[in-house]
Amino acid sequence: MAEAEKTVRTLTGRVVSDKMDKTITVLIERRVKHPIYGKYVKRSTKLHAHDEANQCKIGDKVSIRETRPLAKTKSWALVEVLERAVEV
């Protein structure tokens, strides 16, 4: 039996927390059509992702991919930083 090739799930979002060591919290926003009224509404999900080098800061736009569970709530890993947050 040949092994089926798995597609790697990747998502893009904003870093909302970097207070943990080697972990970031990423906010994923998506637009969903309301089933009755038809209006598009924003829905969001917060995911914990592994950041090995502690390179992300709050406000960065990042790309993450699904991986094996690394902790109780962490099963995503940082792929790359797409856009750095503006320093104030």
Curated annotation (Swiss-Prot):
Question: What cellular-component terms does GO give this entry?
Answer: cytosolic small ribosomal subunit
One Pfam family this sequence matches = Ribosomal_S17
Q: Which GO molecular function entries does the Swiss-Prot or TrEMBL record give?
A: rRNA binding; structural constituent of ribosome
Annotated Gene3D superfamilies: Nucleic acid-binding proteins
Parts forming coiled coils:
none
Q: Which GO terms describe its biological process?
A: translation
Tell me where the transmembrane regions lie.
Answer: none
Keywords per UniProt: Ribonucleoprotein, Ribosomal protein, RNA-binding, rRNA-binding
| Amino-acid biosynthesis listed as a keyword | no
Record's superkingdom? Bacteria
Its job? One of the primary rRNA binding proteins, it binds specifically to the 5'-end of 16S ribosomal RNA.
Q: How does it assemble?
A: Part of the 30S ribosomal subunit.
Q: Which family does it belong to?
A: Belongs to the universal ribosomal protein uS17 family.
Under what name is this protein listed? Small ribosomal subunit protein uS17
